[in-house]
Amino acid sequence: MSVEERPVIFDDQSELPKVFVGGRKSKLALVQTQHVAAMLKKVHPDYSFPVLGLTTLGDQVQSKPLYSFDGKALWTKELETLLLEKVPGFDQQDIIVHSLKDMPTVLPDGCELGAILTREDPRDALVMAAGSPYKTLADLPAGSVVGTSSIRRSAQLKKSYPGLVYESVRGNVGTRLSKLDDPETPYKCLILAAAGLKRLDLGDRITGYLQKPDMLHAVGQGALGLEIRQGDEKTKKILEAIYDKESTLCCLAERAVMRTLEGGCSVPIGVETKYENGKLTLDAIVVSVEGTEFVECTQVRAVEENWEAEQLGKDVAEQLVKDGAKKILDAIHLENIK
């Protein structure tokens, strides 16, 4: 890592004690990181929260679909280095802000998940090209091209809409929308996370929402996860004021499903959670890449503690394996090795 990466830095230069908050350099990531810093400043006015925006491997390599990457730390490794080490030219970070769906379920030694914040809309959004007469995927003519780099999305949609064509589209949200609206575009629509569009004030581009039975969202989608150094009790205490219990229980259950199944960006695992009256409902699905095979499981349980949410996720994953998910996942792993 070198200073030539030209990070983005926001620092009020105050004399207050500093708690350094880092995140990715993309527009959406910076919006999210600055949002977290503002939340923290509101509840801890006696501290300063400088923001760092850094380019990660996932930002640098735009020519490959996400599922072709074997690594599970595609968006996090460089930032975790700054959390754990003193790197020349950089301030050591105290908090790293992640879109939780991009955060590996097994963190590097020395790191821990310090807090999960109130979740934004976790659903996937359908975005039609500007001026399109179509309102739903069912409206599209056979052979229409749907843009998504998520194997989870394409696998589930192939199950419900086998007559459509699914092609990768990379880039930040603005770049993807520009590709969609280009008169020469091959895409009829895109599938994007609703939360990201809303955080960028692009909610008006949402044509509709995808949900059961057509689509279960990604693990942790719509939530922000804050990574800290393991054992950093001071920072953990600072984060207590912005932690959200309901979002935490839901997301921990979802992450336990993926951790138990050993999944990452290259595995089509979808989830949906709901927490009401002390009961957590967890629905999870594993789908083959072509959408021809799938296994789904739903369980409901009284949950109050984090460990109970994680146990629910583990139990759902184990039931999926018993029902045939391992066969689907093994086939995907073998295909990725080829």
Curated annotation (Swiss-Prot):
S-(dipyrrolylmethanemethyl)cysteine modification sites are C265
Entry's Gene Ontology cellular component terms? cytoplasm
Which pathway is this protein assigned to? Porphyrin-containing compound metabolism; protoporphyrin-IX biosynthesis; coproporphyrinogen-III from 5-aminolevulinate: step 2/4
Q: Which InterPro entries does the record match to this protein? A: HemC, Porphobilin_deaminase_cofac_BS, Porphobilin_deaminase_N, Porphobilinogen_deaminase_C, Porphobilinogen_deaminase_C_sf
Q: Which GO terms describe its biological process?
A: heme biosynthetic process; protoporphyrinogen IX biosynthetic process
Task: List its EC numbers.
Answer: 2.5.1.61
Instruction: Give one Pfam hit by family name.
Output: Porphobil_deam
Q: Which reaction does it catalyse?
A: 4 porphobilinogen + H2O = hydroxymethylbilane + 4 NH4(+)
Keyword Transferase present in the record's keywords: the answer is: yes
Cofactor info, note text: Binds 1 dipyrromethane group covalently.
GO molecular function annotation? hydroxymethylbilane synthase activity
Task: Specify the enzyme's EC class, one word.
Answer: transferase
State the remark under miscellaneous.
The porphobilinogen subunits are added to the dipyrromethan group.
What does the similarity note say?
Belongs to the HMBS family.
Function noted in UniProt: Tetrapolymerization of the monopyrrole PBG into the hydroxymethylbilane pre-uroporphyrinogen in several discrete steps.
This protein is called: Porphobilinogen deaminase
User: Gene for this protein?
Assistant: HEM3
